[in-house]
């Protein structure tokens, strides 16, 4: 079952978010700490008119979510850029024992519906270059690489 998060879901979202950050930390400990977003952040995203946690449940258990937000490009005021209104997926997480069962695709489909209802033009997300399973998943559900972010340590 799919639904939007309510304030009563904060604790479960926090637990899933902690699991996500443990995985992200294992992939890039130079970027991520193995701790979740603060509960106040989760609350603010639930209460915001521009964002939602899309929840997927199995037998009334939250098994995954996608955090999506409506965004306007900061470059819209510059003539050299095409105006851009889009959805951004901050996070998409499914519990390990529920992966490869279609829940991730269901979340992407619902996020797409969410964005279309707001007349947004695209959905963006970030994925670590060494998160091969996530990259393969996003490729399967239609995401394409369109920009590469580079970093040089000094």
Question: Where on the chain are the PLM-derived regions?
Answer:
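Conserved acetyl-CoA pyrophosphate-binding loop and the N-cap/start of the following alpha-helix
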Residues: 98, 102-110
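A short beta-loop-alpha structural element at the N-terminal edge
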Residues: 1-15
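Conserved beta-strand-loop-alpha-helix junction that forms the acyl-donor binding cleft
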Residues: 110, 125-134, 151-154
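Conserved active-site tyrosine of GNAT-family acetyltransferases
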Residues: 138, 143
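A short helix-loop-beta-strand connector motif used in the catalytic cores of GNAT acetyltransferases and
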Residues: 43-55, 88
């Amino acid at each position: 079952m799919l639904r939007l998060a309510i304030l009563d879901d904060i604790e479960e979202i926090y637990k899933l978010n902690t699991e996500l950050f443990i995985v992200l930390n294992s992939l890039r400990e130079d970027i991520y700490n193995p701790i979740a977003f603060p509960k106040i952040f989760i609350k603010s995203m639930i209460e915001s008119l521009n964002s939602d946690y899309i929840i997927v449940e199995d037998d009334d258990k939250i098994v995954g979510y996608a955090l999506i937000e409506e965004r306007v490009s900061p470059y819209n005021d510059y003539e050299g850029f095409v105006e851009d209104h889009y959805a951004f997926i901050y996070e998409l997480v499914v519990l390990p024992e529920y992966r490869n069962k279609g829940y991730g695709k269901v979340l992407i489909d619902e996020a797409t519906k969410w964005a279309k209802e707001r007349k947004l033009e695209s959905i963006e997300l970030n994925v670590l270059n060494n998160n091969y399973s996530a990259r393969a998943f996003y490729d399967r559900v239609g995401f394409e690489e369109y920009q590469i972010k580079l970093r040089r340590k000094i």
